[in-house]
Design a protein with these regions (language model features):
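Polyanionic/metal-chelating signatures
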Residues: 64, 69-207
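Active-site environment of divalent metal-dependent phosphoester hydrolases
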Residues: 30-33, 83-87, 191-194, 214-219, ...
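Histidine-rich, glycine-flanked metal-binding segment
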Residues: 1-20
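Conserved beta-strand scaffold positions in the cores of enzyme catalytic domains, especially
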Residues: 9-13, 110, 341
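N-terminal metal-binding scaffold of metallo-dependent hydrolase/deaminase domains
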Residues: 1-6, 328-331, 346
Length: 351
């Protein structure tokens, strides 16, 4: 279309380049895991810390952000780590800004939970709950029951201050889950996914399956789960290790997508190199997922899962001007690389 170009506009020569919406990373820890012993996204003092928020752990000056900008990632959903069974509240941030307040575009996005070896390893080694998968399920269910009771007492008080239960920020956050204002974002692999599905059904709460290695064993259960917001798969480059990491079935993305599940691909950065996200997406193409569908798993799908598709994830009038230019076609060409990243209409990286 011939559009009027204002005098102040920057003209970008993009002949031969591939333009697409800014990449949305649906599961990340950027800005919160620094060098050495810095674990600001893991409050490992209690097995359940629903009151804490990832927002307060993010260092806007972290070197993670220039790295992900160079990779074409314009928005990250930043979650607490998986040391605790209930890790805290999740937020979404743009990759550029002078402060976390300026960068954050949604808080909260979800409440982080974790199953399996991570919380078992943290607390079992201290001879504390949870030492087993039984214990993990008990921690989640008991906290949901407490929050349900708290909510019922609030409703019964009918606004009378003297009848209200003592204020509890953690329970308030879990009540957001029970009211289905936000989903739980669950670190889980293999049969731990079935625990997530059972608990979500029991309490009628929305959820995402994060990592989801081994999903190919449970297609029918996952695809029929009524409150599933999406599957956030990856990182796909993880080694085939014993136990939970033993089945990195990237081919499941084609089946889940074809059967109507909203799928996204994560970096888990900075734990895994965020620059590898496009290469990981290429693995999904190699193993059978159509290229156009894989690009959606990097853009509009994670935006939908985070409840941000009104702002990001596609190039449409009225949405944020988050655009990336690639030399080569990402997830299709091995040599494809990001050569320009635009966030909120401003070029923040150019090769």
């Amino acid at each position: 279309e011939k559009l009027p170009v204002p005098d102040y506009a920057e003209i970008i020569e993009a002949d031969g380049l591939f333009a697409m919406p800014g990449i949305v990373d649906a599961h990340s820890h950027v800005g919160g895991f620094g060098a050495g012993d810095s674990q600001d996204l893991n409050e490992m003092t209690c097995n359940a810390t629903p009151a804490v928020e990832s927002f307060y752990a993010i260092d806007s000056d972290s070197k993670d952000f220039p790295r992900i900008i160079r990779a074409g990632i314009t928005t990250s959903v930043i979650a607490p780590g998986s040391g605790n069974v209930i890790g805290g509240m999740v937020c979404a941030c743009k990759s550029m800004g002078r402060s976390t307040t300026e960068m954050c575009i949604k808080n909260p996005v979800a409440l982080k939970m974790a199953l399996g070896g991570n919380p078992k390893g943290v607390y079992g080694s201290k001879n504390q709950l949870p030492m087993t998968r039984m214990g993990i399920a008990e921690v989640i269910r008991s906290n949901l029951f407490k929050a349900r009771d708290y909510m019922q007492k609030q409703q019964a008080a009918n606004g009378a201050p003297e009848k209200m239960p003592p204020y509890d920020q953690g329970l308030e956050n879990i009540c957001k889950v029970l009211r289905r204002e936000i989903p739980i974002k669950v670190h889980c692999e293999q049969f731990d996914m079935m625990t997530t599905l059972r608990i979500a059904e029991e309490f009628n709460i929305s959820f995402t399956l994060d990592h989801a290695w081994g999903a190919s064993d449970f297609y029918d259960e996952i695809c029929s789960a009524k409150n599933l917001v999406g599957v956030i798969f990856g990182p796909t480059g993880v080694g085939l290790l014993p136990g939970e990491c033993g089945k990195v079935d990237i081919e499941c993305l084609e089946v889940l997508d074809r059967r109507g599940v909203t799928c996204a691909i994560m970096t888990d950065g900075p734990i895994m190199n965020p620059e590898l996200l496009v290469g990981q997406a290429g693995e999904a193409v190699r193993l059978g997922t159509p290229h156009e569908r894989v690009l959606r798993m990097l853009t509009i799908n994670p935006a939908k899962i985070a409840g941000l598709d009104d702002r990001i994830g596609s190039l449409e009038p009225g949405k944020d001007a988050d655009i990336v230019l690639f030399k080569g076609i990402p997830a299709l060409d091995v040599a494809a690389r990001c050569v320009r990243t635009i966030i909120n209409g401003e070029t923040v990286y150019a090769e």
